[in-house]
Amino acid sequence: MTDKTLYQFNYSQDIVHLQTVYSLFNRVSNIIFSVTFDEGFDDTLMTNAIQLLMKRNDCLRLKFVKEGKVTKQYFEAERYIGEIPSLTFRTNCQMYSFIRKFRRKAIDVRKGETMNVVYATDPTGNRM
């Protein structure tokens, strides 16, 4: 299994876990969060800020494993987000279509996913 120290879920995690186990699609919906910049967006600086967020925030370094029928968790010492895709949308219809598809894509916490980050440029040229 793993040589890491495993922890039981706390009550609020247990509620979310039970929602995923007993829901129709076995997942919790993605919560779309975006920040729009009309000037001065630096991909490298933002990627470094996200890396720092993952380093300092324990919940972004959680990893889940099954031990028998019970799901447990442990903390990874280091976590890296990798390369962040950058998209450019020509029309609002194209952008909203992508957002609808992205929102429906499940985050698989058992594979270590905690968040999906995408850089984008909207049709007016603003960076997100």
Model-derived segments and their meaning:
Residues 8, 47, 54-128:
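Acyl-thioester-dependent condensation/acyltransferase catalytic cores
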Residues 1-43, 48:
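N-terminal beta-alpha "docking/capping" segments at the starts of catalytic domains
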